[in-house]
From Swiss-Prot:
Placement of sequence motif GXXQDXHW: 412-419
Protein name per the record: Thermostable carboxypeptidase 1
Domain of life of the source: Bacteria
Chain positions of motif I/NRXXA/SD: 357-362
Temperature dependence: Optimum temperature is 80 degrees Celsius.
Enzyme class: hydrolase
Residues spanned by motif HPF: 245-247
Key words, A-Z: Carboxypeptidase, Cobalt, Hydrolase, Metal-binding, Metalloprotease, Protease, Zinc, Zymogen
Domain Peptidase M32: residue ranges: 3-506
Length: 511
């Protein structure tokens, strides 16, 4: 068999696998949005059966045979060619999948499905003790998986693993390591705490009461749809639905869905939650369709994905220019804003206040929420913390970093869906996304000129096109670190983000 024939076999086989994965994504969307209460048990078994089938395909020995034919051939001489990018990723996925026993793959799928279902039921009841057995099972399985992946090792192009946590982190942010994250987070938290002290000491406080007036759910949805369309989200290739925990999910080309949640007494959750998920969806809609079903057509990492969502939620969506364009329309849609001035509204949606809930945190304190989760996850995987002690450790870290502490579990250790789905190692990608976003945005302004005047005129296409060319079109051709450096000229770091916050919040809070 020639290398060309082997590569064609790989393309066809992996695309077929991607179609099956796409069905899994559709089932996952349904589970989080529309499924009847009594359907969860059957759905968990469906997901386990699909996981078994996907694992069988991922470990098919023909993959190894085809890869051997292609590796070392002229097809992959250029390490940045489409074929080389695909083959390298397929080899890594094949070795990782072969190392995971089918029994573990199926158990993980079922435990994740059951864990999310339990979390949805038990969190509103504040039932930590009821949730703990699910979390223990998920953690044990994740640790078993990490031990196996640790033995397999990383991609040869990436740094070696230093500890168990790295093996899971690497699945979300290729090349990221705990030993690099810890000093980066220390630098960031030092800058954030200094900025937070100046904000709280400024004496200025926005009237956030305007955000807690009455905002009917249907009006929020209608307004959110207008924003989506104006910013460039293709509503003929997606949809917006309500859910308990907002998410974006790509079913496939032409089907990238957004969910959000609305509170009639809080403006931010529904509107900025929608803009956040829209950022994710714009990335998915901008990936090269010709490469769908291959690594070349996938996002570079969750951190890069998060850079797109945080950009549209915050750097665009919370800018004064954005609301110069949309606040007059918001006043038409929401009568409760009739007496509110643009400047006061803009200050309110950028209010800084230490709080308990990560997804509702402001730009200044958000990454301190992530620091808490990173330190707790590291302690768990290093054997320095037991799950039974997690709630108290959570409270202690919130007191230390944010000066607040939860009185219950639902707004404390149970607030996020991630651990209920076994997603250990995911949280750091949120902060990395914020850092990447600031660097990308600064570079875009350097090349396109000031962006806020464009936003004020409702012109979002120049910026969206820039991100499509520089980031989306590249798929996973580059590792996250290399992509950031290629686009911005600098490696990922904290300083661009801290400069952005300093300029914005210095102006708002008068220092």
């Amino acid at each position: 068999m020639t290398p060309e024939a082997a590569y064609q076999n790989l393309l066809e086989f992996q695309r077929e696998t991607a179609y099956l994965g796409s069905l899994g994504a559709l089932a996952a969307w349904d589970q989080r949005t529309m499924i009847p209460r009594k359907g969860h048990g059957h759905r968990a078994r469906q997901m386990a059966a699909l996981a078994r089938l996907l694992h069988e395909r991922a470990t098919d020995p023909r993959i190894g045979e085809w890869l051997e034919k292609v590796e070392g051939s002229s097809l992959v001489e250029d390490p940045l060619s489409d074929a080389a990018v695909n083959v390298r990723a397929w080899r890594r996925a094949y070795e990782r999948a072969r190392a995971i026993p089918e029994r573990l793959a199926v158990e993980l799928a079922q435990a994740r499905s059951e864990g999310e279902t339990a979390w949805e039921a038990l969190r509103p009841r504040d039932d930590w003790q009821g949730f703990l057995p699910y979390l223990k099972r998920l953690f044990a399985l994740a640790k078993e998986e990490a031990e196996i992946l640790m033995a397999v090792g990383p991609d040869p192009l990436d740094p070696p693993y230093g500890e168990l946590y790295d093996a899971l982190l690497d699945g979300y942010e290729p090349g990221a390591r705990a030993r690099d994250l810890e000093p980066l987070f220390r630098e960031l938290s030092s800058g954030l705490k200094g900025l937070l002290d100046r904000i709280l000491g400024s004496g200025r406080r926005p009237d956030v009461g305007v955000l807690h007036r009455h905002y009917p759910k249907e009006a929020q949805r209608a307004f959110a749809l207008e924003l989506l369309q104006a910013c460039g989200y293709d509503l003929e290739a997606g949809r917006l639905d309500p859910t308990a925990h907002p998410f974006e999910i790509a079913i496939g080309p032409g089907d990238v869905r957004i969910t959000t949640r609305y509170y009639e007494d809080f403006f931010n959750a529904g509107i900025f939650g929608t803009l956040h998920e829209m950022g994710h969806a714009l990335y998915e809609q901008g990936l090269p369709e010709a490469h769908w079903g291959t690594p070349r057509g996938e996002a570079a990492s969750l951190g890069v994905h998060e850079s797109q969502s945080r950009t549209w939620e915050n750097l665009v969506g919370r800018s004064l220019g954005f609301w110069e364009r949309f606040f007059p329309r918001a006043k038409e849609v929401f009568s409760s804003l009739a007496d509110v001035r643009l400047e006061d509204f803009h200050f309110a949606v950028n209010a800084v206040e230490p709080s308990l809930i990560r997804v509702e945190a402001d730009e200044v304190t958000y990454n301190l929420h992530i620091l808490v989760r990173l330190e707790l996850e590291l302690a768990l995987f290093r054997g320095e913390l037991f799950l039974e002690d997690l709630p108290e450790a959570w409270r202690e870290k919130y007191r230390a970093y944010l000066g607040v502490a939860p009185r219950d579990y639902k707004d404390g250790v149970m607030q996020d869906v991630h651990w209920s789905g076994g997603m250990f190692g995911y949280f750091p990608t949120y902060t990395l996304g914020n850092l990447y976003a600031a660097q990308f945005f600064a570079k875009a302004q350097e090349e396109l000129g000031p962006l806020e005047p464009l936003f004020a005129r409702g012109e979002f296409t120049p910026f969206l096109d820039w991100t499509r060319r520089k980031i989306h079109a590249e798929g996973s051709r580059f590792r996250p670190r290399a992509l950031v450096e290629r686009v911005t000229g600098s490696p990922p770091g904290a300083q661009a983000f801290l400069r952005y916050l300093e300029a914005k919040y210095g102006a708002l809070y008068g220092f």
